[in-house]
Amino acid sequence: MPATVAELQAEIAAWIHPLNPDRRPGGTIAKLLEEIGELIASDRAHDPLEVADVLILALDLATLLGVDVTEAIRAKLAINRARSWARADNGAMRHIPGSDTPSFP
C-alpha cells in the first residue's frame, strides 16, 4: 500500500532524529542545495535514489518547519494552474511574471 506524505515524513523523522536531533532548517536547506547540485552535475540524474535524497531532505525540512506538505502542494498547484506559463530556453517551464498570483492562505 502506498504511504501518505505524512507517513513518509514520520518515517524520515524517525530515522534522522536519533542521528541528528539538533538539526536546524538552515542546515537542512544547505544539505538540500548540496544534493540538488550533485544531482544536476551527476550522470546519475535519472537515478531514483539520487532523486530520493533530495525528496528526503525536502520532506524533513517541511517537518522541521511544521509544513503540511499535502495542503501546501495543493494550494501551490491551485496558484500554478491560474498562472500563464512559457517554456524557458533550458526546457523547463516558468510562469509569466504578472500572471494571476493569489497568495497562500
Curated annotation (Swiss-Prot):
Keyword Transmembrane helix in annotation: no
Protein family (similarity comment): Belongs to the Caudovirales dATP/dGTP diphosphohydrolase family.
InterPro entries named among the record's database cross-references: dATP/dGTP_dipphydrolase_MazZ (IPR007538)
Annotated protein name in UniProt: dATP/dGTP diphosphohydrolase
Major enzyme class: hydrolase
Requisite cofactors: Co(2+)
One Pfam family per UniProt: dATP-dGTP_PPHyd
Described function: Catalyzes the hydrolysis of dGTP into dGMP, which is needed among other for the first step of biosynthesis of dZTP (2-amino-2'-deoxyadenosine-5'-triphosphate).
Reactions catalysed, as given in the entry: dGTP + H2O = dGMP + diphosphate + H(+); dATP + H2O = dAMP + diphosphate + H(+)
Keyword Metal-binding: yes
Alphabetical UniProt keywords: Cobalt, Hydrolase, Metal-binding, Nucleotide-binding
One of the record's GO molecular function terms: hydrolase activity
EC number: 3.6.1.9
Pathways per UniProt: Purine metabolism
